[in-house]
Every structure is written in C-alpha cells, then in structure tokens.
Amino acid sequence: MTAIAQQAADRDQAQAESKAAILIESLSWLQRFHDRIVVVKFGGNAMVDEELTRTFAEDVVYLRYAGLRPVVVHGGGPQISAMLTRLGIDSEFRGGYRVTTPEVLEVVRMVLTGQVSRDVVRGINAHGPLAAAVSGEDAGLFTGRRRGAVVDGVEVDLGLVGDVVSVDPTAVLAQLDAGRIPVVSSIAPDESDPAVSLNVNADAAAAALAVALGAEKLVILTDVAGLYRDWPDRGSLVSDIRADELRALLPSLESGMIPKMAACLEAVDGGVPKAAIIDGRIPHSMLLEIFTTNGIGTEVVPA
C-alpha cells in the first residue's frame, strides 16, 4: 500500500471510529427517552427556510423511529405577517403581542391551520404517513382566557389574544397511541365564549401541553444560540440553569427571550424534567440536544 493510500485508509478508520463513538454516546439517551413524549416548539427562521424545515422534519421522524413520541407545536408569526400584508390588513404589536381583531384572527387561523400546519405535516409525511394536524380548537385541546398587556404603565387591549388556561390532551394522546406525530397549531377557544377563538403564544402553548402530557422534555427552537446572561456578550451563553436562578434572572432578559424562557420555566415548574431552547438555524440541532451529553443551547432543570 502506498503512503497516500495508507493515509486515506487511516482517515476512513478515524471517521468510522468517530461515528461509532457518537452512536455509543447516544445509547444512554435512547434508553432514557424510549417511549417518552418530547414536545418540540417549531418556530423562528427554521419555519421560513426550506432547507431548515426539511432537516427539522427529518429530525422529528428520526425521533419517532428511535422510539420517542414527538409532539410538534408551531406558531406562524412570519407567515401571518406576510399574509396580513398581502391582504392589506393593518396589524400592530403592543407589549410584544400582536393586537388581534376578529379580521386578524381569521387570518391567524387560516395561516396556522391551513398553511403552516399543512406544510409541517407534508414535510414529515415525505418520510412516511406519520404526521397528523391537530388544532388547539379540536376536542377541547386548549382553552384560553383573554389577556391584556401593560405598555408604559398603561393597560392596553390586545383584542382576541389569550393565555392557555387548561389543556385536555386526549386528542393528542389518541394520535400518539396510533403511532402518529401530532402537529399542533396554537389557537384556543375562549373559556367565556367557546364560539370565539383566541390567538395564543405558541411557546406558552407548548409548555402547557408538555405539562399536560407528562412529557420528558420540552424543546423550543429559536433564532439564537441560547440564553445569554449579559447579551450581547457572546461569552455569557448559559449551557444550563436551575429554575430558581432563571426565575430571578427573567425580569432582566431581552423582551424577545422572556416568553421562551418563561415557557421553559412553566414546563419545569409543572413537572417536566427538562426544558431547553436551542438554535433552530443549525441543521439537526434537535438531535444534538437530545442525543448528546453536552447538548446544544440552554437547558432548564428543576431547582
């Protein structure tokens, strides 16, 4: 064998050993998560980038065939904004929430259940007939309560915006028991008038569902690497944090990060063993988070 051929053989051997080490590292996590429910909140740039959407679908299918029971909850902010602009409907944000008139809500429902949900289901089902769409309105899955917001010390009316106040996971459990991957859109009937639906935050909806399902983990995809103690100092990235530490840190966080970290806190406080925010811009970040020891992003654990 020539020197060049020997070098190539050595490289192949090293690559094979590296792959084997990665597979063995995943063994303990495969054991831990076997037949366990993992709730994944899909959002951010991953929703509008075709390649990231494709790799997300691959990850979800991988989880399913690896013996986990994944549940996807999605928002649709970018798509909703695009559709409102296309239809010439004015929309504004107050206190970080989209003011939702009845006209806006019809667009929200149309985009979430008729566009985003279908796109996610189609991406997953490219690998087999596995995914099924479920709306938060279906079979009493979510019940919401209207909320306002405080802006500059003044309470403002957000319209048809609410918080999830109760979850009946029966419809989702039925899909899981049938071997399917539920894809859940974040909209909820109003508890005071079930004929009226509310636009609810998808991060909070995912957390509430994770608690109701007794999930092993909540994973929220974001557009940042994780939680920073002192943004924009990239050296302040937090790999893991206890719930009590996060609770104290929460008021000082950037406004865009607060709902996501609050959702992680709600999940852990509700009995979910771990919750994490990860960078959805990195292909296959979900697999790195679940099946490697160091994970990726920021993990929240009980105090």
From Swiss-Prot:
Pfam families referenced in this protein's UniProt entry, alphabetically: AA_kinase
Superkingdom to which the source organism belongs: Bacteria
Annotated site (Transition state stabilizer): 41, 260
EC number(s) recorded for this UniProt protein: 2.7.2.8
InterPro entries reported in the protein's UniProt record: AceGlu_kinase-like_sf, AcgluKinase_fam, ArgB, Asp/Glu/Uridylate_kinase, Glu/AcGlu_kinase, NAGK-C
Catalytic activity: N-acetyl-L-glutamate + ATP = N-acetyl-L-glutamyl 5-phosphate + ADP
GO cellular component: cytoplasm
Major site of localization recorded for this protein: cytoplasm
UniProt record, GO biological process: arginine biosynthetic process via ornithine; L-arginine biosynthetic process
Cellular localization per UniProt: Cytoplasm
One of the record's GO molecular function terms: acetylglutamate kinase activity
Root EC class: transferase
Keywords: Amino-acid biosynthesis, Arginine biosynthesis, ATP-binding, Cytoplasm, Kinase, Nucleotide-binding, Transferase
Free-text function comment from the UniProt entry: Catalyzes the ATP-dependent phosphorylation of N-acetyl-L-glutamate.
Pathway(s) served: Amino-acid biosynthesis; L-arginine biosynthesis; N(2)-acetyl-L-ornithine from L-glutamate: step 2/4
SUPFAM superfamilies registered for this protein in UniProt: Carbamate kinase-like (SSF53633)
Taxonomic source organism: Clavibacter sepedonicus (Clavibacter michiganensis subsp. sepedonicus)
Name of the protein this chain belongs to: Acetylglutamate kinase
